[in-house]
Regions:
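Conserved phosphate-binding and hydrolysis motifs of nucleotide-dependent enzymes
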Residues: 7-8, 168
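Conserved C-terminal structural/oligomerization subdomain of aldehyde/semialdehyde dehydrogenase
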Residues: 35, 89, 139-215
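ALDH superfamily catalytic-core signature
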Residues: 2, 8-156, 185-186, 212-213
Length: 215
C-alpha cells in the first residue's frame, strides 16, 4: 500500500515528512514551461500553446502556464497569440460553442483575478484578457466565475506570476536568446511536472528534453 496525494505543495511536503518508510506518490502542482524556438512550425506551436494553457480553463496541473519564445520570433508570435486568445469564446460550458468556461468557485476566481492584477503591478504587459469578468456575458451568466483568457507579456522570471501556480487561464510570456538561457529560466522554478519544446531541430529538442528538470 502507498499514500497518493494530489494537491498543494506545502501539504504534500508535510505528508512526505510524516510518511516514514511508506511508499508515496505526490502530484503537487506545476508551472510548466513551453519553449518555442525560431525554427518551430509556428501554426502548430500557436495551436499547442493555446491549448496547453486555456483548455479546461487553465485549471490543470500540467497547464503550460509559462511560454518562452525565442527573441527573433517573439514580436510576431506573441501578437498572433494574443489575438487568438482574445477570440476565444467564454461562456456556458454546456454550449458546444464555448471554449473557456467558469472557474471552480468565487474564492478561486478572486485568487486568479488577484494574480492578474499582481502581474500588472509587477511590470508585466497585459496583451489579452484582464482581471474583470467579460463584459459581454449574457444576463444569466453574470454571477458566474468567468475570466477572459489572459496573456501577460514581458514577464521577468522573478515575478510571482512566473513562479507561483495560478491554476487559471493566465499565461506568463518571456523571451530568450539561446538554448542555454532557455534551459536556465525553464528550470528556475520549484515545480517540475511537465514541459514542452517546439523546434524542427531534433538534436536541439533532444538536448532540451535531457536538460529540462521536469517529468
Amino acid at each position: 500500500r502507498a499514500v497518493s496525494f494530489t494537491g498543494g505543495t506545502a501539504t504534500g511536503r508535510n505528508i512526505m515528512k510524516n510518511a516514514g518508510l511508506k511508499k508515496y506518490s505526490m502530484e503537487l502542482g506545476g508551472k510548466s514551461p513551453v519553449l518555442i524556438f525560431e525554427d518551430a512550425d509556428i501554426e502548430r506551436a500557436l495551436d499547442a500553446a493555446l491549448f496547453t494553457i486555456f483548455s479546461i480553463n487553465g485549471e490543470r496541473c500540467t497547464a503550460g502556464s509559462r511560454i518562452f519564445i525565442q527573441q527573433s520570433i517573439y514580436p510576431e508570435f506573441v501578437k498572433r497569440f494574443a489575438e487568438r486568445a482574445n477570440r476565444l469564446r467564454v461562456g456556458d460550458p454546456t454550449d458546444p460553442n464555448t471554449q473557456v468556461g467558469a472557474l471552480i468557485s468565487k474564492q478561486h476566481w478572486e485568487k486568479v483575478s488577484g494574480y492578474i492584477r499582481l502581474g500588472i503591478e509587477e511590470g508585466a504587459t497585459l496583451l489579452a484578457g484582464g482581471a474583470d469578468k467579460p463584459a459581454d456575458l449574457p444576463a444569466h451568466l453574470r454571477n458566474g466565475n468567468f475570466l477572459r483568457p489572459t496573456v501577460l507579456a514581458d514577464v521577468d522570471n522573478r515575478m510571482r506570476v512566473a513562479q507561483e501556480e495560478i491554476f487559471g487561464p493566465v499565461l506568463a510570456v518571456t523571451t530568450f536568446k539561446t538554448m542555454e538561457e532557455a534551459l536556465e529560466i525553464a528550470n528556475d522554478t520549484q515545480y517540475g511536472l511537465g514541459a514542452g519544446v517546439w523546434s524542427r531541430n531534433g538534436n536541439l529538442a533532444y538536448k532540451m528534453g535531457r536538460g529540462i528538470q521536469a517529468g
